[in-house]
Regions:
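Structural signal for interior beta-strand "rungs" in well-ordered beta-sheet cores
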Residues: 101-217
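Glycine-rich adenosine-cofactor-binding loop
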Residues: 2-21
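Short active-site oxyanion
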Residues: 3-4, 35-37, 72-75, 189
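Short hydrophobic segments within beta-strands
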Residues: 6-7, 40, 78
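NAD(P)-binding Rossmann-fold cofactor-contacting core
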Residues: 23-50
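Short alpha-helical
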Residues: 11-12, 83-84, 114, 198
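Phosphate-bearing ligand-interacting subdomains
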Residues: 44-108
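Short amphipathic alpha-helical segments
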Residues: 17-19, 51-52, 87-91, 133, ...
Length: 218
Protein backbone atom coordinates (compact mmCIF):
# COMPACT_ATOMS: atom_id res chain seq x y z
CA UNK A 1 0.00 0.00 0.00
CA UNK A 2 1.17 3.49 -0.85
CA UNK A 3 0.06 6.51 1.16
CA UNK A 4 -0.70 9.45 -1.14
CA UNK A 5 -2.12 12.94 -1.01
CA UNK A 6 -4.14 14.43 -3.84
CA UNK A 7 -3.02 17.97 -4.65
CA UNK A 8 -5.92 20.19 -5.65
CA UNK A 9 -9.43 20.48 -4.23
CA UNK A 10 -11.42 21.30 -7.37
CA UNK A 11 -13.41 19.28 -9.85
CA UNK A 12 -10.53 17.34 -11.36
CA UNK A 13 -9.35 16.47 -7.87
CA UNK A 14 -12.64 14.67 -7.25
CA UNK A 15 -12.41 12.99 -10.65
CA UNK A 16 -8.93 11.85 -9.67
CA UNK A 17 -10.37 10.40 -6.47
CA UNK A 18 -12.86 8.49 -8.63
CA UNK A 19 -9.95 6.98 -10.56
CA UNK A 20 -8.10 6.06 -7.36
CA UNK A 21 -11.20 4.48 -5.83
CA UNK A 22 -11.87 2.45 -8.99
CA UNK A 23 -8.23 1.34 -9.08
CA UNK A 24 -8.39 0.23 -5.45
CA UNK A 25 -11.56 -1.81 -6.03
CA UNK A 26 -9.85 -4.04 -8.59
CA UNK A 27 -6.20 -4.11 -7.53
CA UNK A 28 -5.18 -7.58 -6.38
CA UNK A 29 -1.83 -7.02 -4.71
CA UNK A 30 -1.99 -5.09 -1.42
CA UNK A 31 1.11 -3.11 -2.39
CA UNK A 32 -0.79 -1.64 -5.36
CA UNK A 33 -3.47 -0.08 -3.15
CA UNK A 34 -3.40 3.73 -2.91
CA UNK A 35 -4.33 5.06 0.52
CA UNK A 36 -5.46 8.69 0.27
CA UNK A 37 -4.33 10.52 3.40
CA UNK A 38 -6.10 13.74 2.42
CA UNK A 39 -6.23 16.69 0.06
CA UNK A 40 -3.68 19.49 -0.33
CA UNK A 41 -4.75 22.93 -1.56
CA UNK A 42 -3.45 26.41 -0.77
CA UNK A 43 -6.82 28.12 -1.14
CA UNK A 44 -9.76 25.70 -1.29
CA UNK A 45 -13.24 27.14 -1.63
CA UNK A 46 -15.89 26.37 0.96
CA UNK A 47 -18.01 24.54 -1.60
CA UNK A 48 -15.09 22.33 -2.63
CA UNK A 49 -14.26 21.55 1.01
CA UNK A 50 -17.90 20.55 1.56
CA UNK A 51 -17.96 18.41 -1.59
CA UNK A 52 -14.85 16.57 -0.46
CA UNK A 53 -16.15 16.10 3.08
CA UNK A 54 -19.32 14.55 1.69
CA UNK A 55 -17.00 11.85 0.36
CA UNK A 56 -15.06 11.63 3.64
CA UNK A 57 -11.95 13.42 2.40
CA UNK A 58 -10.41 16.30 4.34
CA UNK A 59 -8.28 19.21 3.14
CA UNK A 60 -5.16 18.90 5.28
CA UNK A 61 -3.57 22.22 4.34
CA UNK A 62 -1.52 23.80 1.60
CA UNK A 63 1.79 22.97 -0.03
CA UNK A 64 3.76 24.34 2.91
CA UNK A 65 1.88 21.96 5.21
CA UNK A 66 2.64 19.02 2.92
CA UNK A 67 6.34 19.82 2.75
CA UNK A 68 6.68 20.42 6.50
CA UNK A 69 4.54 17.56 7.81
CA UNK A 70 4.79 14.84 5.13
CA UNK A 71 1.44 13.07 5.66
CA UNK A 72 2.54 11.05 2.63
CA UNK A 73 5.69 10.85 0.54
CA UNK A 74 3.76 10.43 -2.73
CA UNK A 75 1.43 12.90 -4.39
CA UNK A 76 -1.13 12.78 -7.19
CA UNK A 77 -1.79 16.03 -9.06
CA UNK A 78 -5.55 16.46 -9.27
CA UNK A 79 -5.23 19.74 -11.19
CA UNK A 80 -6.28 20.38 -14.77
CA UNK A 81 -4.11 23.38 -15.67
CA UNK A 82 -0.84 22.27 -17.31
CA UNK A 83 1.06 25.36 -16.13
CA UNK A 84 -0.10 24.99 -12.53
CA UNK A 85 0.76 21.29 -12.63
CA UNK A 86 4.29 22.16 -13.72
CA UNK A 87 4.80 24.77 -11.00
CA UNK A 88 3.60 22.49 -8.22
CA UNK A 89 5.35 19.34 -9.41
CA UNK A 90 8.70 21.07 -9.75
CA UNK A 91 8.43 22.40 -6.20
CA UNK A 92 7.38 19.06 -4.69
CA UNK A 93 10.04 17.17 -6.61
CA UNK A 94 12.70 19.54 -5.28
CA UNK A 95 11.45 18.75 -1.77
CA UNK A 96 11.91 15.03 -2.36
CA UNK A 97 8.29 13.96 -2.73
CA UNK A 98 7.39 11.37 -5.34
CA UNK A 99 4.83 11.59 -8.14
CA UNK A 100 2.21 8.84 -8.21
CA UNK A 101 0.07 8.06 -11.23
CA UNK A 102 -3.11 6.02 -11.59
CA UNK A 103 -5.05 4.49 -14.49
CA UNK A 104 -8.76 3.78 -14.32
CA UNK A 105 -9.53 0.08 -14.83
CA UNK A 106 -12.10 0.99 -17.48
CA UNK A 107 -9.52 2.78 -19.62
CA UNK A 108 -8.14 0.81 -22.57
CA UNK A 109 -4.35 0.85 -22.69
CA UNK A 110 -2.49 -0.84 -25.54
CA UNK A 111 0.90 -2.51 -25.80
CA UNK A 112 4.47 -1.19 -25.69
CA UNK A 113 3.55 2.09 -24.05
CA UNK A 114 5.78 4.25 -21.86
CA UNK A 115 3.91 5.71 -18.88
CA UNK A 116 5.95 8.00 -16.63
CA UNK A 117 5.20 8.90 -12.98
CA UNK A 118 2.20 11.09 -12.25
CA UNK A 119 0.14 10.10 -15.30
CA UNK A 120 -3.63 9.98 -14.76
CA UNK A 121 -5.85 8.15 -17.25
CA UNK A 122 -9.59 8.42 -16.65
CA UNK A 123 -12.49 6.09 -17.38
CA UNK A 124 -13.28 5.46 -21.03
CA UNK A 125 -9.97 6.80 -22.33
CA UNK A 126 -8.33 4.79 -25.09
CA UNK A 127 -4.55 4.70 -25.42
CA UNK A 128 -3.27 2.88 -28.50
CA UNK A 129 0.09 1.13 -28.98
CA UNK A 130 3.62 2.56 -28.68
CA UNK A 131 2.38 5.71 -26.99
CA UNK A 132 4.60 7.75 -24.66
CA UNK A 133 2.95 9.61 -21.79
CA UNK A 134 5.47 11.79 -19.98
CA UNK A 135 5.30 12.99 -16.37
CA UNK A 136 1.95 14.28 -15.14
CA UNK A 137 0.10 13.84 -18.42
CA UNK A 138 -3.65 13.72 -17.81
CA UNK A 139 -5.99 11.92 -20.21
CA UNK A 140 -9.59 12.76 -19.35
CA UNK A 141 -12.70 10.60 -19.81
CA UNK A 142 -13.34 9.22 -23.30
CA UNK A 143 -10.29 10.86 -24.87
CA UNK A 144 -8.44 8.84 -27.52
CA UNK A 145 -4.67 8.77 -28.10
CA UNK A 146 -3.52 7.19 -31.37
CA UNK A 147 -0.60 4.87 -32.05
CA UNK A 148 3.00 6.11 -31.83
CA UNK A 149 1.99 9.41 -30.27
CA UNK A 150 4.07 11.27 -27.67
CA UNK A 151 2.40 13.50 -25.08
CA UNK A 152 5.08 15.56 -23.36
CA UNK A 153 5.10 16.39 -19.66
CA UNK A 154 2.21 18.24 -18.01
CA UNK A 155 -0.02 18.00 -21.07
CA UNK A 156 -3.76 17.69 -20.37
CA UNK A 157 -6.12 16.05 -22.86
CA UNK A 158 -9.69 17.05 -22.04
CA UNK A 159 -12.80 14.84 -22.34
CA UNK A 160 -13.60 13.41 -25.75
CA UNK A 161 -10.54 14.84 -27.51
CA UNK A 162 -8.89 12.75 -30.22
CA UNK A 163 -5.14 12.84 -30.77
CA UNK A 164 -4.40 10.82 -33.90
CA UNK A 165 -1.40 8.59 -34.55
CA UNK A 166 2.21 9.78 -34.91
CA UNK A 167 1.44 13.11 -33.19
CA UNK A 168 3.76 15.01 -30.84
CA UNK A 169 2.14 17.31 -28.27
CA UNK A 170 4.59 19.56 -26.44
CA UNK A 171 4.93 20.22 -22.70
CA UNK A 172 2.22 22.14 -20.81
CA UNK A 173 -0.20 22.05 -23.72
CA UNK A 174 -3.95 21.84 -23.14
CA UNK A 175 -6.12 20.03 -25.69
CA UNK A 176 -9.74 21.09 -25.22
CA UNK A 177 -12.82 18.91 -25.00
CA UNK A 178 -13.80 17.32 -28.30
CA UNK A 179 -10.78 18.69 -30.19
CA UNK A 180 -9.17 16.61 -32.94
CA UNK A 181 -5.48 16.62 -33.91
CA UNK A 182 -4.89 14.91 -37.24
CA UNK A 183 -2.26 12.29 -37.96
CA UNK A 184 1.44 13.05 -37.89
CA UNK A 185 1.27 16.64 -36.64
CA UNK A 186 3.46 18.59 -34.22
CA UNK A 187 1.97 20.77 -31.49
CA UNK A 188 4.48 22.93 -29.66
CA UNK A 189 5.07 23.84 -26.03
CA UNK A 190 2.45 25.72 -24.02
CA UNK A 191 -0.29 25.64 -26.64
CA UNK A 192 -4.03 25.68 -26.10
CA UNK A 193 -6.19 23.75 -28.54
CA UNK A 194 -9.74 25.04 -28.20
CA UNK A 195 -12.75 22.84 -27.60
CA UNK A 196 -13.97 21.11 -30.79
CA UNK A 197 -11.10 22.53 -32.85
CA UNK A 198 -9.75 20.42 -35.70
CA UNK A 199 -5.97 20.77 -36.04
CA UNK A 200 -4.88 20.14 -39.64
CA UNK A 201 -1.32 21.53 -39.56
CA UNK A 202 1.56 21.93 -37.11
CA UNK A 203 0.95 24.41 -34.27
CA UNK A 204 3.89 26.59 -33.14
CA UNK A 205 4.69 26.88 -29.45
CA UNK A 206 2.57 29.25 -27.37
CA UNK A 207 -0.35 29.46 -29.78
CA UNK A 208 -4.07 29.17 -29.06
CA UNK A 209 -5.69 27.26 -31.92
CA UNK A 210 -9.46 27.43 -32.40
CA UNK A 211 -12.03 26.55 -35.04
CA UNK A 212 -12.40 24.15 -37.96
CA UNK A 213 -9.82 24.06 -39.41
CA UNK A 214 -7.93 25.38 -36.40
CA UNK A 215 -6.34 28.81 -36.79
CA UNK A 216 -4.26 31.06 -34.55
CA UNK A 217 -2.87 34.57 -34.51
CA UNK A 218 0.53 34.87 -36.22
Amino acid sequence: MTDVVVVGAGGFSRETLDVIEAHNRVCIRPEDHLNVMGIIDDNPSTINIDRLRSRHYEVLGGLDFLIANRPAEAYVLGIGSPRVKKQIAERLDREGLHAQGVIHPQAVVGSDNIVEPGVIVCSGAQISTNVQLDRHVHVNPNATIGHDTHLAEFTSINPGAIVSGEVYVGPTTLVGAGAVILQGLFVGTGCTIGANACVTKDVPSGKTAVGIPARWAT
